[in-house]
């Protein structure tokens, strides 16, 4: 059975944020725990886990690949496979390649054209390489995905008017507060999303930016870039009272802000409104916070309306990008099919060469001693004959194998026609048998 490419995943279209956080694999713990082992069934694996999607790429043999990935994924999160299954999509072969190229090109993102997904995919690939979980197929596929993403960004305008999740968060804040110059914002986390949010907040005219991060030095570095103030993480709840707008984007595995924490903050603020935007998955802020008076909590799924308004501007460019994706998907499919054909070509050439060498040895034995020049001439003649005899069948196989549906059938015919799978009968045995029949 031939190896195939499988993509198993869920995203912002198939699962809400509460489901995505239950099944998030932000630390690639599936690989670390070895619950998708590299063996005869699964030979390569890569995990992409972001706030909007979890996708597992696997190369393997047979339908057991999907069930094994689902079991491992659910087990890694301490969940039941049946709870995961309703939210999952599965792509195989050509469809898996197309989907990955769409993802890498940000055509499948909540924010079409956003640049973060490509960096996240590259990071996932780096981690898979570090754990020795990729081989020739995924290596080729991921490099091709990066190339496709580059083509889309350079040959279309799909990214020219793109917004980021951070931009959408700030736009939502502007709709609530209007003029921003009399309000203060706090960023919890100091990663790429926080940096983008700081950029958009500053552009919107925010009066002050605070940055709270577990690693104080990183928080101070980000605050310095935007003329803000860094806060020690242990002082978070004391300083929350200073902020009107809080945007949280940490990589915590559970909520870091709960309703009981905010009650005291509200008292110290004399119950002035607080606006929380949680763009982390898993979520940083307990949903119960939204039940408090004068507190307004939004999560990443609430940003879709802002994103949809921006989407209309990019639909035409996205259509051009999809044409590129289709073209490159076809090219990769041809390469993958050529990979399937290669063992048959190698076996055919090796069999022909073995027969030629056996015949040469038999001929030299009959001739007796010959000089080196004669021997070289005989070897050159046989080598030329092998190449010329194999040229037509190999060319025919390559041409027919490019036909997606017919390719495997022609491989099977060729292997049977040239007896390439008969391991028990040496290639010269048939010649000896035929010669024996002719002599009698």
UniProtKB/Swiss-Prot annotation:
It holds the Pfam family Shikimate_DH. Coiled coil: none annotated. Substrate binds at residues 50-53, 109, 114-116, 120. It catalyses: (S)-4-amino-5-oxopentanoate + tRNA(Glu) + NADP(+) = L-glutamyl-tRNA(Glu) + NADPH + H(+). The keyword Lyase does not apply. It is an enzyme of class 1 (oxidoreductase). During catalysis, the active site Cys acts as a nucleophile attacking the alpha-carbonyl group of tRNA-bound glutamate with the formation of a thioester intermediate between enzyme and glutamate, and the concomitant release of tRNA(Glu). The thioester intermediate is finally reduced by direct hydride transfer from NADPH, to form the product GSA. Homodimer. This is Glutamyl-tRNA reductase. It comes from Nitratidesulfovibrio vulgaris (strain DP4) (Desulfovibrio vulgaris). The gene is hemA.
């Amino acid at each position: 059975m031939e190896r195939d490419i499988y993509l198993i995943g869920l995203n912002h279209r198939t699962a809400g944020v509460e489901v995505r956080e239950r099944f998030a694999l932000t630390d690639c713990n599936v690989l670390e725990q070895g619950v998708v082992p590299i063996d005869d069934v699964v030979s390569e694996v890569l995990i992409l886990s972001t706030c909007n999607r979890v996708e597992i790429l696997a190369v393997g043999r047979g339908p057991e690949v999907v069930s094994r990935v689902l079991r491992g994924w659910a087990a890694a999160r301490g969940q039941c496979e049946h709870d995961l299954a309703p939210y999952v999509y599965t792509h195989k072969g050509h469809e898996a390649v197309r989907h990955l190229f769409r993802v890498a090109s940000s055509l499948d993102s909540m924010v079409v054209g956003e640049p973060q997904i490509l960096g996240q995919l590259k990071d996932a690939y780096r981690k898979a390489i570090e754990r020795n979980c990729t081989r020739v197929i995924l290596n080729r596929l991921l490099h091709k995905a990066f190339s496709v993403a580059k083509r889309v960004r350079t040959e279309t305008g799909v990214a020219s008017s793109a917004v980021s999740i951070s931009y959408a968060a700030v736009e939502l804040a502007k709709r609530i507060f209007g003029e921003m110059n009399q309000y203060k914002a706090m960023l919890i986390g100091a990663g790429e999303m926080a940096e983008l949010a700081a950029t958009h907040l500053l552009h919107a005219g925010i009066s002050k930016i605070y940055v709270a991060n577990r690693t104080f030095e990183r928080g101070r570095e980000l605050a310095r870039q935007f003329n803000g103030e860094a806060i020690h993480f242990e002082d978070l709840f004391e300083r929350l009272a200073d902020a009107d707008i809080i945007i949280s984007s940490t990589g915590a595995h559970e909520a870091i802000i709960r309703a009981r924490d905010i009650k005291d903050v509200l008292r110290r603020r004399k119950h002035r409104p607080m606006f929380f935007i949680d763009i982390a998955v898993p979520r940083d802020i307990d949903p119960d916070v939204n039940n408090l008076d004068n507190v307004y909590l939004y999560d990443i799924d609430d940003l879709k309306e802002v994103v949809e308004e921006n989407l209309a501007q990019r639909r035409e460019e996205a259509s051009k990008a999809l044409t590129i994706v289709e073209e490159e998907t076809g090219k990769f499919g041809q390469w993958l099919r050529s990979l399937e054909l290669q063992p048959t070509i190698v076996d055919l050439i090796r069999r022909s060469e073995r027969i030629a060498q056996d015949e040469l040895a038999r001929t030299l034995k009959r001739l007796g001693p010959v000089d080196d020049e004669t021997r070289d001439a005989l070897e050159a003649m046989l080598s030329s004959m092998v190449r010329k005899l194999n040229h037509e069948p190999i060319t025919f196989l390559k041409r027919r194998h490019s036909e997606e549906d017919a390719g495997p059938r022609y491989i099977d015919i060729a292997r049977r026609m040239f007896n390439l799978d008969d391991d028990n009968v040496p290639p010269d045995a048939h010649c000896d048998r035929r010669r024996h029949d002719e002599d009698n």
